[in-house]
Design a protein with these regions (language model features):
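Polar/charged alpha-helical tracts
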Residues: 54, 58, 344, 442, ...
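Long, contiguous, compositionally biased segments that the model treats as domain-scale units
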Residues: 1-145
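Active-site-facing alpha/beta catalytic cores
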Residues: 77-78, 83-327, 370, 378, ...
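Non-transmembrane, aqueous-exposed alpha-helical and coiled segments at domain scale
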Residues: 307, 313, 319-351, 357-406, ...
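Short glycine-enriched loops at secondary-structure junctions
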Residues: 117, 356-357
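Polar low-complexity intrinsically disordered regions
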Residues: 1-3, 344, 452
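Short coil-to-beta-strand
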Residues: 66-67, 351-353
């Protein structure tokens, strides 16, 4: 007779977050479909497994110890319509291309993670949006409400969590097929990068591309097992913004009797929801997943230490990742005291730069792009600070796409504002396009090579 799996409903403490303040929370508890939606999510299969989550923790422990580099990228906010094979393969392909370049530059393995298969919600600075005298709830991502500016579309609908779950499942299925079925073959990915370097706009990166080419040919000449290089590990992560969703997908691991969030391998807490006494920190502190926290320019060393005490009291390498999003103008001044305080405490979080969120600008035309030069400058500042302090710059977290969008100004093959009318496609924040993403990877590889 099979012993039933332990239930998260019986595990102590998993619902204490409900008694705390909850920032950015949808107004849907009174919706007639709320209870049924939660009940269904409580019963669905996990999207990821505890063993995979544990493997990611061990990989991130390597990053914390300076033995690997962490790459995370994907959409600002995924859309249900964007979960097609072409769109998903484009994002995965771009991340794989970036990872090959970073692996060569760092001379270290790269932990690859998509900001995918669950990034369907977004925090907003205002609960409401007004257009032409009409005020409606803000768009909070397709797992909460619709983008169209109508009363019907903007209702917070809990049934959208179910669609988000099923869309995430199909996305993860495709990711696993791509990364385990030959799509990730090192030689194929490298050939794509040679095409990038052949563009005259990116001539400065041709030398490194050719060095990688020689390394691949050398491996082949030495009889390397390229069959083993046809597959790769690839993890999924998203911001754990919707606690109703995350709690409903919490499962108790039958091996350890410990709770895991099974909506993703990696979950992070945003800058707007990292209140130490808040619901987000409380729930995620109880899960065994590796956890990230976004740190903005207002973060103090004391803030970081209190977050460590709350989320990583055992000081386990690989448990906690600090994702700094301070802005190019702030990072060289604001980041050092935070790192020093953490170093002096003996904690070993992974340090990752998010060079996107602190660098959004507003143009008179109404568009909100990022400037590629600002993104690059924040990355450069991140590496400079770590070099000066003797600490390890563990990774980069970018909002990007595999498509030829025009949302971030500049780059070696520059995007101009005149392109926005036809190619500015994001429903939320601006993303690096395919070529800009690869250029960032080559630049980071240069910084890593210099550090070595």
């Amino acid at each position: 007779m099979t012993t039933p799996s332990p239930s998260a409903a019986d595990y102590p403490g998993l619902d204490e977050w409900r008694e705390r303040s909850i920032g950015q929370h949808p107004q849907w508890a009174e919706h007639p479909d709320f209870a049924d939606s939660i009940q269904e999510l409580n019963a669905v299969p996990p999207l990821v497994f505890a063993g995979e989550v544990d493997r990611l923790r061990s990989r991130l422990a390597q990053v914390a110890n300076g033995e690997a580099f962490f790459l995370q990228g994907g959409d600002c906010a995924e859309t249900f319509a964007g979960a097609t094979a072409d769109k998903i393969s484009g994002r995965v392909r771009t991340l794989l291309q970036m990872a090959v370049v970073l692996t060569y530059g760092a001379s270290l393995p790269v932990v690859k993670m998509g900001r995918m298969a669950g990034q369907f919600s977004k925090p907003r600075s205002s609960n409401e949006e007004t257009r032409d005298g009409v005020t409606l709830p803000s768009f909070r991502g397709e797992m909460v409400n619709g983008f169209d500016f109508t009363e019907e579309s903007r209702v917070h609908d809990p049934k959208r969590m179910l669609r988000g779950y099923h869309t995430s499942a199909s996305t993860l299925n495709l990711i696993r097929a791509f990364t385990q079925g030959g799509f990730a073959d090192l030689r194929r990915v490298h050939a794509w990068n040679m095409g990038f370097a052949a563009n005259p706009a990116y001539a400065r990166y041709e030398t490194m591309a050719r060095e990688i080419d020689h390394a691949v040919k050398f491996m082949a000449a030495c009889g390397s097992d390229f069959d083993a290089l046809k597959t790769t590990e690839f993890f999924a992560g998203h911001e754990a913004l919707l606690l109703d969703y995350e709690r409903a997908l919490t499962r108790i691991d039958s091996r350890t009797n410990l709770p895991y969030g099974t909506s993703a391998h990696f979950l992070w807490i945003g800058e707007r929801t990292r209140d130490l006494d808040g619901a987000h920190v409380d729930l995620l502190s109880r899960l065994r997943n590796p956890i990230g926290v976004k740190l903005g320019p207002g973060t103090s060393g004391e803030d970081a230490l209190r977050l460590i005490d709350a989320l990583d009291p055992e000081r386990e390498p690989g448990r906690l990742t600090f994702i700094t999003r301070m802005g190019a103008k702030n990072i060289r001044e604001k980041l050092p005291p935070v790192i020093r305080a953490v170093e002096e405490s003996g904690a070993k979080p992974v340090w990752v730069t998010d060079p996107m969120h602190g660098n959004t600008v507003s143009l008179p035309s109404g568009y909100k792009p990022r400037r590629f030069e600002d993104v690059v400058d924040e990355v450069r500042g991140f590496f400079e600070v770590h070099r000066e302090l003797g600490t390890f710059p563990g990774g980069i977290h970018v909002e990007m796409t595999g498509d030829d969008v025009a949302e971030c100004l500049g780059g070696s093959d520059p995007v101009a504002e005149s392109s926005f009318a036809e190619r500015y496609e994001t429903l939320c924040d601006p993303r690096l396009n395919h070529m800009q993403s690869l250029e960032i990877a080559f630049l980071v590889a240069e910084y890593l090579s210099e550090q070595n």
